[in-house]
């Protein structure tokens, strides 16, 4: 059974905790995880790239010069895609909110649980106890990570009320600070170590113990 390393931020004590439930006992399936990552990244795209087509470019629609007798190649108007400053043929246009890759809820949950289970099996899951910052302190945040022995990149999941801790850790370049619902499969795979505060860990496991 996978275990998480528990570190007490107040006393510096270390312990281990068994990880139970579907969050940590799901077999990772690479094809499902791949689909989830692609869907997540597609959902973050804004799809706002826009180019002007021939009809949207300013300019006359008149033929530039006569068809015959000039010795030059025949040409149409100045808005032709072949000319500098002309319209773009087949260029990108803004797309609607339903555009992009989709994944159903069951697959998304299986991918998330599989990625989390893989981190737990590798021993790269940590729970941080007694994370109480009276005021933001990046120095103390860096010292805590050093005492824990974690190396970046680190994904730190905090509860929404742990504001001082979030302000302390977010200045560290190797740490990505997110809320309980602010990360997905992509962030789990990108991080070397995943650290949960005790409150964030409680939110993660709530309602999933029975599957």
UniProtKB/Swiss-Prot annotation:
Top-level taxonomy: Bacteria, Bacillati, Actinomycetota, Rubrobacteria, Rubrobacterales
Function of the molecule: One of the primary rRNA binding proteins, this protein initially binds near the 5'-end of the 23S rRNA. It is important during the early stages of 50S assembly. It makes multiple contacts with different domains of the 23S rRNA in the assembled 50S subunit and ribosome. Forms part of the polypeptide exit tunnel.
Keyword list, A-Z: Ribonucleoprotein, Ribosomal protein, RNA-binding, rRNA-binding
Family according to the record: Belongs to the universal ribosomal protein uL4 family.
Annotated GO biological process: translation
Cross-referenced NCBIfam families: rplD_bact
Keyword Lyase: no
Gene Ontology MF terms in the entry: rRNA binding; structural constituent of ribosome
Annotated region (Disordered), positions in chain: 1-28, 48-99
Biased composition (Basic and acidic residues): 10-28
Protein name from the UniProt record: Large ribosomal subunit protein uL4
KW Glycoprotein (keyword) present: no
PANTHER family in the record: 50S RIBOSOMAL PROTEIN L4, LARGE RIBOSOMAL SUBUNIT PROTEIN UL4M
GO-annotated cellular components: ribonucleoprotein complex; ribosome
Subunit structure: Part of the 50S ribosomal subunit.
């Amino acid at each position: 059974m996978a275990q998480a390393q528990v570190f007490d931020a107040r006393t510096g004590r270390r312990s281990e905790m068994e990880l139970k439930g579907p969050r940590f006992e799901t077999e990772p399936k690479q094809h499902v995880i791949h689909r989830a990552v692609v869907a997540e990244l597609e959902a973050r795209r804004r799809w706002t790239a826009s180019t002007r087509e021939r009809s949207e470019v300013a300019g006359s629609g008149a033929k530039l010069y006569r068809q015959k007798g000039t010795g030059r190649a025949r040409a149409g108007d100045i808005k032709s895609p072949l000319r500098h400053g002309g319209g773009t043929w087949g260029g990108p246009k803004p797309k609607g909110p339903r555009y992009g890759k989709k994944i159903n809820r069951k697959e998304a949950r299986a991918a998330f649980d599989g990625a989390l289970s893989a981190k737990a099996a590798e021993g790269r899951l940590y729970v941080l106890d007694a994370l109480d910052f009276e005021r933001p302190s990046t120095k103390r945040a860096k010292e805590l990570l050093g005492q824990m022995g974690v190396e970046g990149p680190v994904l730190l999941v905090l509860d929404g009320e742990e504001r001082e801790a979030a302000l302390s850790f977010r200045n560290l370049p190797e740490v990505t600070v997110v809320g309980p619902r602010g990360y997905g499969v992509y962030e789990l795979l990108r991080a070397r170590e995943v650290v949960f505060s005790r409150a964030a860990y409680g939110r993660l496991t709530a309602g999933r113990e029975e599957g």
